[in-house]
Amino acid sequence: MAPGLDLTPDFHPPTTTTTTTNNAPPQQRTLLLAPPTLATHGEARLATLFTTTYPRATTDLQMLDRLAAGLVTLPATTYDLVLVLTDPDGSRRAEAAALLADRAVWARLVPAVRAGGRVASEEGGGEGTEFLGDQRVGREAVLAGLVAGGVGGFVKPEYAEEEAVPLRFGKKKAAAAAAAAVSSAGPAVGTVKVATATSAGKKEEVGMVPPAVAAAAAAPAGVGFVDFSDDLDLDVEDDEDVIDEETLLTEEDLWRPIQQPPECQPQPGKKRRACKDCTCGLASRMEAEDKARRAKADSDLNTLKLKSEDLNELDFTVQGKTGSCGSCYLGDAFRCSDCPYIGLPAFKPGEEVKIVNNAIQL
């Protein structure tokens, strides 16, 4: 075997890793909101702003109309200043105010502003909640969570982080204070033996605990008693005024027509129906009408019912005798459903009808 050379180093120096921490504050970023006309007729002015006042590296430009249409998504908590470009003379103020009066624009804009960031206009000014000379724009900004700034515009407030604070009732401290309050003579005694004038020289036990304290000590643990006769020293008059509900409505209110909700109005060609949770009285009125209609139908039906003594057999074989309808002899086509001559052929009034061998003989 041919000899070989080991070229790996025998000395391994320790390797150290250096970690650099960047504690520098975040870079200030600015968002410029431009009306649509500024993009078509203000290219030179935008170039001047980027070269003189707002560096392009830390400045973003968005169009107000695209933001209002929801075509732009802004990064969250990014901008320290949101500047609405309206020209120093305010020539584009009305155009920008018309777009910022939409609540959806502020809903997309405010989350992109950092805590403590400002929303201002290029022309400045504005008192109170007025922004771009329009109270509506300022109202929408306040409803979105901004507060009016002192130098015009609005500021996003810095809210402190929520922190849970435990509630301690100090039961241990109260128990320690009660134990320290006991005198050095020992614990309190409940009864003592003393000689009285009526005891004839004998000592009697006398209670040293007040009755109220003794009753409270005799109560079981965890059970409380409420004295409903105690008014807690509140100045409450016994003769409280009770409002009569019948006096809340006047005669004019009672005669006023009921305003029918739109959902209760019947559709064309359909019968009016009441809602499940009807409160206008339509359901009760329709129920009363149904009951009255059913009662009338029952009464009409009872008038048509005949008793057993009224159902006398009518002899059609006698000349001149006819049924109540007068058409029994004409045939089944003219007979009632309960006619006893159903199935018989037509015959003449007074004609004798015989049945021989289950065959009808006229």
UniProtKB/Swiss-Prot annotation:
<feature type="binding site">
    <location>
        <position position="264"/>
    </location>
    <ligand>
        <name>[2Fe-2S] cluster</name>
    </ligand>
</feature>
<feature type="short sequence motif" description="Cx2C motif 1">
    <location>
        <begin position="325"/>
        <end position="328"/>
    </location>
</feature>
<keyword id="KW-0963">Cytoplasm</keyword>
<feature type="region of interest" description="Fe-S binding site B">
    <location>
        <begin position="325"/>
        <end position="339"/>
    </location>
</feature>
<comment type="function">
    <text>Component of the cytosolic iron-sulfur (Fe-S) protein assembly (CIA) machinery required for the maturation of extramitochondrial Fe-S proteins. Part of an electron transfer chain functioning in an early step of cytosolic Fe-S biogenesis, facilitating the de novo assembly of a [4Fe-4S] cluster on the scaffold complex CFD1-NBP35. Electrons are transferred to DRE2 from NADPH via the FAD- and FMN-containing protein TAH18.</text>
</comment>
<keyword id="KW-0001">2Fe-2S</keyword>
<dbReference type="GO" id="GO:0016226">
    <property type="term" value="P:iron-sulfur cluster assembly"/>
</dbReference>
<keyword id="KW-0496">Mitochondrion</keyword>
<feature type="compositionally biased region" description="Low complexity">
    <location>
        <begin position="15"/>
        <end position="28"/>
    </location>
</feature>
<feature type="binding site">
    <location>
        <position position="275"/>
    </location>
    <ligand>
        <name>[2Fe-2S] cluster</name>
    </ligand>
</feature>
<feature type="binding site">
    <location>
        <position position="336"/>
    </location>
    <ligand>
        <name>[4Fe-4S] cluster</name>
    </ligand>
</feature>
<dbReference type="Pfam" id="PF16803">
    <property type="entry name" value="DRE2_N"/>
</dbReference>
<feature type="binding site">
    <location>
        <position position="278"/>
    </location>
    <ligand>
        <name>[2Fe-2S] cluster</name>
    </ligand>
</feature>
<feature type="binding site">
    <location>
        <position position="325"/>
    </location>
    <ligand>
        <name>[4Fe-4S] cluster</name>
    </ligand>
</feature>
<keyword id="KW-0479">Metal-binding</keyword>
<keyword id="KW-0004">4Fe-4S</keyword>
<protein>
    <recommendedName>
        <fullName>Fe-S cluster assembly protein DRE2</fullName>
    </recommendedName>
</protein>
<feature type="short sequence motif" description="Cx2C motif 2">
    <location>
        <begin position="336"/>
        <end position="339"/>
    </location>
</feature>
<dbReference type="GO" id="GO:0051539">
    <property type="term" value="F:4 iron, 4 sulfur cluster binding"/>
</dbReference>
<dbReference type="GO" id="GO:0005758">
    <property type="term" value="C:mitochondrial intermembrane space"/>
</dbReference>
<dbReference type="GO" id="GO:0051537">
    <property type="term" value="F:2 iron, 2 sulfur cluster binding"/>
</dbReference>
<comment type="similarity">
    <text>Belongs to the anamorsin family.</text>
</comment>
<dbReference type="GO" id="GO:0046872">
    <property type="term" value="F:metal ion binding"/>
</dbReference>
<dbReference type="InterPro" id="IPR046408">
    <property type="entry name" value="CIAPIN1"/>
</dbReference>
<feature type="binding site">
    <location>
        <position position="280"/>
    </location>
    <ligand>
        <name>[2Fe-2S] cluster</name>
    </ligand>
</feature>
<dbReference type="InterPro" id="IPR031838">
    <property type="entry name" value="Dre2_N"/>
</dbReference>
<dbReference type="Pfam" id="PF05093">
    <property type="entry name" value="CIAPIN1"/>
</dbReference>
<dbReference type="GO" id="GO:0009055">
    <property type="term" value="F:electron transfer activity"/>
</dbReference>
<dbReference type="InterPro" id="IPR007785">
    <property type="entry name" value="Anamorsin"/>
</dbReference>
<feature type="region of interest" description="N-terminal SAM-like domain">
    <location>
        <begin position="24"/>
        <end position="165"/>
    </location>
</feature>
<keyword id="KW-0408">Iron</keyword>
<comment type="subunit">
    <text>Monomer. Interacts with TAH18. Interacts with MIA40.</text>
</comment>
<feature type="region of interest" description="Linker">
    <location>
        <begin position="166"/>
        <end position="254"/>
    </location>
</feature>
<feature type="region of interest" description="Disordered">
    <location>
        <begin position="1"/>
        <end position="28"/>
    </location>
</feature>
<feature type="region of interest" description="Fe-S binding site A">
    <location>
        <begin position="264"/>
        <end position="280"/>
    </location>
</feature>
<feature type="binding site">
    <location>
        <position position="339"/>
    </location>
    <ligand>
        <name>[4Fe-4S] cluster</name>
    </ligand>
</feature>
<keyword id="KW-0411">Iron-sulfur</keyword>
<feature type="binding site">
    <location>
        <position position="328"/>
    </location>
    <ligand>
        <name>[4Fe-4S] cluster</name>
    </ligand>
</feature>
